[in-house]
Regions:
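Short, small-residue-biased leader/transition segments that mark boundaries at the very start
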Residues: 1-2
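Extracellular glycan-recognition modules
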Residues: 17-21, 25-50, 54-62, 66-130, ...
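Core-facing hydrophobic residues within beta-strands of well-ordered domains
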Residues: 20-21, 153, 186, 205
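Flexible glycan-contacting loops in extracellular carbohydrate-active proteins
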Residues: 59, 176-205
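Short, aromatic/His-centered strand-loop micro-motif at the edge of beta-sheets
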Residues: 77, 130-155
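Surface-exposed coil/turn segments at beta-strand junctions on protein surfaces, enriched
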Residues: 84-86, 148-151, 182-184
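Localized edge beta-strand/strand-to-loop motifs within extracellular or lumenal beta-rich domains
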Residues: 152-166
Length: 219
């Protein structure tokens, strides 16, 4: 008797785009609030501290979460399947870093750590990978003049359509490359360090957003 092999399919919900996946903003809080939990305004869930809680400060006209290198948060939700493999994505953040080290991780959206499996927002002076790190080589992007941005607000905007990735800082295109990613299923998202617990971030985060779609920067 012929038996039909069942085709393994992801649940339909996993194949539908979420749009906004991660959305955090210090504007949701009052200055001097201590926040052990950050409610996510994208997909359902929250971020919880694994160590010390963040304190909300006001810095140069913006409310911001103050990272001192000791705060690490992880999400209660997995990275959606819509961001796996070579899927399009858009990432936006407002960051201020008083003293920019070589490698500091603001947010690691992935828990895998093989080549091209990372989407990691960094804020470092490393010219090869100091803005976005995919655990590639050519595929990563840095900014040679990053040190000049110390103590200033940086509007970081990164968009990838499945082929070309553009990286903007304060509206200036600092990288544009033809790349391919191999993002694997990821158990959680990490704030303040990478998933391996390295590259502590010391600075201020006003807001962070991640979409599972390509949204070119509007002029």
């Amino acid at each position: 008797v012929y038996k039909r092999q069942d085709i393994v399919r992801l649940p339909v919900a996993d194949q539908q785009k979420h749009g906004l996946v991660v959305s955090l903003s210090a504007d949701d809080f009052v200055v001097n609030d201590t926040v052990p939990y950050l409610e996510n305004r994208g997909v359902k869930g929250y971020f919880e501290t694994r160590k010390l809680p963040l304190v909300v400060k006001e810095v140069k006209g913006k409310k911001a979460f103050h990272f001192e290198g000791t705060q690490v948060y992880t999400s209660s939700f997995m990275l959606p399947a819509t961001l796996q493999d070579n899927a399009p994505y858009t990432l936006e953040a407002w960051v201020l870093n008083d003293s920019i080290s070589e490698n500091e991780c603001v947010a690691d959206f992935t828990t895998s750590h093989d080549e091209l499996e990372k989407i990691m927002l960094v804020n470092g002076t490393e010219p090869r990978c100091g803005v976005i790190n995919h655990y590639g080589w050519y595929e990563d992007a840095g900014y040679k003049d990053m040190k000049e941005l110390a103590g200033k607000w940086q509007h970081i905007y990164i968009c990838f359509d499945g082929r070309m990735e553009q990286v903007y800082i304060n509206g200036k295109l600092v990288s544009e490359k033809d790349i391919q990613l191999l993002v694997k299923p990821s158990q959680f998202i990490t704030l303040g360090r990478n998933a391996e617990g390295d590259w502590p971030f010391t600075g201020y985060l006003h807001s962070l957003k991640l979409w599972d779609e390509y949204l070119p920067l509007k002029e």
